[in-house]
Amino acid sequence: MDIKQTAVAGSLESSDLMITVSPNDEKTITITLDSSVEKQFGNHIRQLIHQTLVNLKVTAAKVEAVDKGALDCTIQARTIAAVHRAAGVDQYDWKEIDSWNV
């Protein structure tokens, strides 16, 4: 998926995550994370966001995530929503997304 504009999903409420996805001219994926649970789960959150981007076939994006203790399913859902908004895609391929769950 090609990121065309900046988009945001989520909130700064407890147990949520606010994620901002923007185009990246460097043609790489960069993830910046601000989390209250950085020491315990920072690497896991980054890996989950990165894997979700890979599953969506995103090859270049700047991602800024502010985590307030979100569960994995919330992190994944917010990432999916932000990427679709940033790519200008209105339709979700639910079969493809569901196939990620093994």
Curated annotation (Swiss-Prot):
InterPro entries: CitD, Mal_deCO2ase/Cit_lyase_ACP
GO cellular component: cytoplasm
Modification O-(phosphoribosyl dephospho-coenzyme A)serine occurs at: S14
Annotated localization: Cytoplasm
Keyword Phosphoprotein appears in the UniProt entry: yes
Function noted in UniProt: Covalent carrier of the coenzyme of citrate lyase.
Protein name: Citrate lyase acyl carrier protein
Organism whose genome encodes this protein: Streptococcus pyogenes serotype M4 (strain MGAS10750)
Taxonomic placement: Bacteria, Bacillati, Bacillota, Bacilli, Lactobacillales
Name of encoding gene: citD
